[in-house]
Amino acid sequence: TAEAKFIRALSHYHVVRIWALPYGYTSDNSHLGIPLKVSADQTPQMRATVADVYAQIEQDLLDAEADLPASNGIFANQMAAKALLAKVYLEMGDFANAKAKAAEVMNSGTYSLDPVLTNRFADHANGNLPAEFIFTLVSTNESSATDTIVDERGMSFTWNYRSDDPNANPALKASQALYVEATADTNDLRGQLWYEARNAGTPDEFYVVSKFDGSFLDVPLLHLSDLYLIYAECNVRLNGDSDGSGLAKINALRQRAGLTDLTSLTLTDVMSERRLELAFEGDRLFQLKRQGILGEIQTIRGVDWDCPGMVLQFPNFEGT
């Protein structure tokens, strides 16, 4: 039951962020979210409010946190529930609880930051996962499709990024702005190892992403790098990072990327590191919308951050 509640919370969390405006869009979160699926009943349901959706997600995760085992192989464990709670609380603007849950996982001694930057999306031999992975969709190199688990993006996600063919022109590419930011510091391994300019210096120049060139990618839905970023942001927002503990987390990520340490930490620093560290992991849009809720940005690519185009529309046959 605890594993099922964790998966239900994870599913509701991903879906509500795609199909509804963010938490905080209305003062009481009475704006429409998604139909809540809490039973096997196939009867179409009306959309619940975002407040109700997040309340269900939080309760499912608190139940899972209490009942999941400390160790559970490749399946969800107690720390996975805590890690997802940290992400949910960050989305809700509950920075104190987000920081606390991130700290519980980081201080558990169960996980450690992988010293090799590229290991997060390398080929892992049948479940031999990096020490920073908290909850992962595991893929194998077996020929049977039933032996391979993929996330909601499916194989088309990684194949539309692949850059390991020199003649490749993938469907999904980096923007010029991101490429420039990622490669601005020539010591940054993220820029060196994850991007390549093709047709450089010509009008047809474009930028491929090499982050997902592995054949059997394990998809790290929850990992320690993200929690470092959550902790650092929350500490800045709560107390200006007065104790320097957020700075230490950001510098750990920077050191792994080959960069020198920062001497102080601002919110801009944290969000910049998040963009570079989690690029193309399905994170950026939701962070921008979260910053829109907080009044820190007004537009995304020239349009209002909360315009209808920033959420997917429900099909006509769905109860709305």
Question: Predicted segments — roles?
Answer:
Residues K99-L224, L267, E277, E281-G282, ...:
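Hydrophobic-face positions in mid-chain alpha helices that act as interaction patches
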Residues V15-V16, A64, S71, V105-L113, ...:
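Alpha-helical solenoid scaffolds that mediate protein-protein interactions
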Residues T1-S71, S245:
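Aromatic-anchored glycine-rich loop motif in surface-exposed flexible loops
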Residues Y54, F95, D241-D243:
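TPR-repeat structural position
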